[in-house]
Amino acid sequence: MKKLFTTTIMAASLSALTLTGCSSTTSTGAVGVDRQQLLLVSSEQVQQLSAQSYNKNIQEARARGLLDTNKAQLNRLKNISNRLIGQVGVYRPDAAKWQWEVHTIKSNDLNAFVMPGGKIMFYTGIIDRLNLSDDEIAAIMGHEMSHALREHSRERLSRQYATQTGIGVAASIFGLSQGQAELAH
């Protein structure tokens, strides 16, 4: 009876947490889209984790002599990003206050990303190997910025958190250890 009560309380708590965690991250603004997301982790937590990861990437690239090796290319990216950053308030007013940063890593990889909180990273390979114009760079950068503005990383972390919580509840119901429950997952 006690186990059933505990399980019921845990399931109710998980349900309440899930329902209260659904929210929108951006205004419909110019895009006219209002999408509900499961957001159980705070923006501040995600931005802090992103800043730590971004700084680690910068330190590693700097130590290997791969950070911002082409100043003209870096300035080009900063100019493009400044034009795009000027528009973020249309989609998400608080993003205009983010501490935006732009860096390049010398690598042949075709990659670029924008982390929560406005941490922009371009690998030189995507620019050089594809011989991108400013407009093409802006399209890639804008696309990556949209992931940060729409908080896709926060949503992904929240889903992982909900999954782990669900595994914990299931383990409790069936009397499994956390390891057994994760193995079953």
Language model features with spans:
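A Zn2+-metalloprotease active-site environment signal
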Residues: 2-185
